[in-house]
């Protein structure tokens, strides 16, 4: 892959020593390099989501990742220490985004019913927008390092408990374990749909699936115990 000016800004030129990338730079140049590097990093994560979803983590090489993002395989090391670190960054990032987004949704709601409706809309939007990441999480979680597994689990537990707290405001007399089961069942319903829709080639369902998923999820979450 030819080295371009964007590669050099992103630090992807393997011939450039580290001091040449950092030393003597003006603030503007440093900012440009920082932005270019983050852009390249995000491109690698996007490529990883797609390639891991289609082929599985074990069948994707660093060269595959680099080529999909427009860099050489060795250049990937400028952004991640290895392929497992790419997987970790991908699943940690999406888990943190889910938690942060869910917390923002709940904070903006005026009451539990509104919070629940907004959470459902938020998660449906996430699932329809990120089917590849969901597939990678389901299939390749075991390929994470032990530390990344622990961090992803902690973030996702916090996300589940966010839903449980909102549900408790609606079902005040229902056992917490039951509320947690409702949340997990809802995630299963919502998360499984986008890939099944895409795998059957029915792109039309992306538009029609949104209200259907939202209504089904809310019906399950608000049904009497």
Q: What positions do the PLM features span?
A:
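C-terminal peripheral helix-coil segments that are non-catalytic and often amphipathic
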Residues: 1-28, 125, 160-169, 173, ...
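Helix-turn-helix
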Residues: 39-43, 47-85, 89
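Hydrophobic/aromatic residues within well-ordered alpha-helical segments
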Residues: 40, 83, 94, 98, ...
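Amphipathic alpha-helical linker/stalk segments
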Residues: 90-117
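Amphipathic alpha-helical packing segments from all-alpha helical-bundle domains
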Residues: 96-99, 146-171, 180-184, 207, ...
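Helical hydrophobic small-molecule/effector-binding pocket
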Residues: 117-138, 187
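Amphipathic alpha-helical segments used for helix-helix packing
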Residues: 128-147, 195-198
